Amino acid sequence: MAILQSFLLLLSLPFLFTLIYTKKMKESKRNLPPGPAKLPIVGNLHQLQGMVHRCLHELSKKHGPVMHLQLGFVPLVLISSSEAAEEALKTHDIECCTRPNTNAARVFSRNNKNIGLGAYSDEWRELRKVAVREYFSVKKVQSFRYVREEENHLMVKKLRDLALKQSPVDLSKTLFCLAASTVFRPVFGQSFSDNKHFSEEKIEELVFEAQKSLTFKFSDLFPIPGLGWFIGFVSGQHKGLHKVFIEVDNFLNHMIDDHQKQNQPQDRSDIVGSLLDMIHNQEQDKSFKLTIDHLKGITQDIFLAGIDTSAITMIWAMAELVNNPRVMKKVQDEIRSCIGIKKERIEEEDVGKLQYLKLVIKETLRLHPAAPLLLPRETMADIKIQGYDIPRKTLLLVSAWSLGRDPKYWKNPEEFNPERFIDCPVDYKGHSFEFLPFGSGRRFCPGMASAIATIELTLLNLLYFFDWKLPEEMKDMNMEESGDVTIVKKVPLELLPVLYH
């Protein structure tokens, strides 16, 4: 087998060098953005060891806010300034709003039948309309308010018991379970803890394994007929990708089967039930027909992207608050003075009174965007950004992480200081290009309203009912990062809750 692999590699080398030479000749005629020197074949892959968003940030400080790299045979442009981001995501949004055709995108999008990874098309636009109407609209988010309130109440009861025992809490796990619970009931019609097919631990593992599978693989970087497939086959990347996808698909099949066995009447309140009713009752002559694969695509987006991103933001917020006692005291003083000290249960309407809490969340999103490089885009036409040529089929990354730390826009950018947003018009809704935790343009995250509602209410509950401190054996908070598409706190957040009342 090793001899065969070596023989095939030798056969491909002349072809590879011919492609490299041809590509170099074409590039020499274009005004490409600056970037680091590239090695033959691998390009700049050797410079992206470790946390990729940090590697790219350091390179961009040297080469500029519009930077060109080569990953294997795939050209990449990194955007890390507000002006360049506005050109890419607003001026040229229509030319930059598709996704790269990676192995993971093809598999997990079910051939472009979901929103997050699907290519831009008429089908994608129709599917997004359905998803927004059934789950992501402000009206729908408000209709699920009772779920968020009930799940937070259950979380507080469990934390009370632990506080009475003076027992430390793994807040990373607690907040993942809370985020999952607020998704499971509206989407699948059942509690996260009551799932009879998968344990809580298995679902958590599945979410993180799926996120890891969505990263660029070595085989994606050599999109030459046969070569990419060969690399993926020999390395086992294809096998690993399909294994995770099959597990996700099995989970969704179980959820759908449970609904189909219930024989409930129409107008079911959860998303799976509503979409099944739409599939069964849709007009046959419509140009866009919703299918089971579309249903899986929508629910998979919510399941994989909606749980860990909200949990990640809440974890970082609590970590920063414990690290910054001044901010912790100020936000708790606001909460307790506005709400009083005798409330047994927090309601979502209480959030509207709390301006400093909202600033804390903004500052957390600035320093710790859950997806620091957003999701990759691909140019569908030749464009110019900041005067540089960006050819068609170029991978485009926007570093929300770098934008949030740029001293050009933020004073003392590494400091956790919510007051910076007082009387500041900058917001996270996609129109302030120095602050893009949810992206912008046609690929703006549709789950923003749902995520913010969950984050605000959960932090309010944690900060109203409890004081928080490090366990006695811990001297300092470890703030190291870990992850790929999303960036989590490397060491789980363990804190000691102290009952306030």
Swiss-Prot record:
Heme binds at residue 445. GO terms for molecular function: heme binding; iron ion binding; monooxygenase activity; oxidoreductase activity, acting on paired donors, with incorporation or reduction of molecular oxygen. InterPro entries: Cyt_P450, Cyt_P450_CS, Cyt_P450_E_grp-I, Cyt_P450_sf, Cytochrome_P450_71. PANTHER family: CYTOCHROME P450 71B11-RELATED, CYTOCHROME P450 71B25-RELATED. The chain crosses the membrane at residues 1-21. It is an enzyme of class 1 (oxidoreductase). PROSITE patterns: CYTOCHROME_P450. Its EC number is 1.14.-.-. Its cofactor is heme. Pfam families: p450. It is found in: Membrane. This is Cytochrome P450 71B25. Keywords: Heme, Iron, Membrane, Metal-binding, Monooxygenase, Oxidoreductase, Transmembrane, Transmembrane helix. The keyword Cell cycle does not apply. Belongs to the cytochrome P450 family. GO terms for cellular component: membrane. It is a single-pass membrane protein.
